[in-house]
Amino acid sequence: MALVFKLDRSLESCWPVELRPVGEGSFEKETFESWWARNQSRLSHLPSDLCEQWIYKHWTNSPFDFLPLESLTWERQTWGGEELLRSIYRAWGGDLHPEFDYRTFQRKGGNDRHPTARALDVGTWDYPMVLLSTPHGVVDFGEVRPKVRLVIVEGHQRHRYLNALHVLNRPPMGPHEVIVLKSTLIS
């Protein structure tokens, strides 16, 4: 019998230390281009935009670093905004506050807008959101959620702003690209 995936447990990172960006956590972190040149052959089964936005940029703070990179499979998909918002689950994120989120990302509304706002304000985001397939649901904070099929791995800010735009009747044109990961840990 298939089991739901337990989000509310702490799993150790299994990412190979050799993949850690040089200078991670400092102002001298190597560029993605340098990092990719060193690691592309090891990660060649994954798209470069996924590797840049998730593994490289979020090396020290991804709660999904327990996923074995070598066995991940992926699929690039395109979704409409409302369908995406209905279909994805945001673990560990708490409640959304659309008006606050809108103001946070808009800042003063000019060139100082957050990059997420600048991208979505012209139709869609600049990097695909990364989602994890959870075919049997999840357990989050002790609550069983059997209908959850997709959990946000990377893209929480894009999710917050997309939600704010939809709630405030300002939905971006879209469509929105996502990368759906599948792991042998969750089957």
Briefly describe each language-model feature range:
Residues L7, E12-E28, G80, P135-V138, ...:
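Intrinsically disordered, low-complexity acidic regions enriched in Pro/Ser/Thr
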